[in-house]
């Protein structure tokens, strides 16, 4: 069993671990486009919860810690992998709602719910990515049937690492670049940081270091275009566009999501009671924003070519 304090500290530890090694994760980034920002986006997403988590008292419940983290990550989510990361922690919030402490089975269910939410939110789920890594980790957690949290999380990390190392076999662009999936590597750094606290250790300290790549990444990063992994002319929707919709009363973004899917790709939309975080790769960001404003006022714009 873990307390709210332990869960709070574990999430902080995971956030620090990905922040410390974000540059190395950026260098692995070749899918869906080789824009070299996956580690940074994931770090900023989970890092958005740090101020609120650090302010929580040691007496907090697991429900309070998970809800605070999930809410902050939804609003701060950046990039495709960042939005998926926020969905994983939203699963924690839903599974742990109303609970003071959490059993191992609760954490397994939380991870499973997060993965299910992520698959539903992604327009076209692609295997060999963060989705595969977290799905197989969650399946192993559910199958473990252990009451021991450290043992459960060790199973999560072991299954996730195995899945990560297999990603080049599922996604040809990764094998061509000689790397594992950047999003999968990023979430494993988060899980490993959490494991240190679940095992009774201290929170991972914040200090950026070079992470040891799981496969040779010499072809990744600045060399991917020269390697012809993805030519510029092959990218039809060249603008990564992201924004928050602060919804009008009674507004539902279901139709907005359909519009984004019809006019772009890499669409991920996550919705809370009063806000929706929308991510899309498109050739016309202005058209996306013009449609979105019909559902509420917009903030947190990010448009990158």
Regions found by a protein language model. Give the residues of each.
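N-terminal loops that bind phosphate or other acidic moieties
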Residues: 1-305
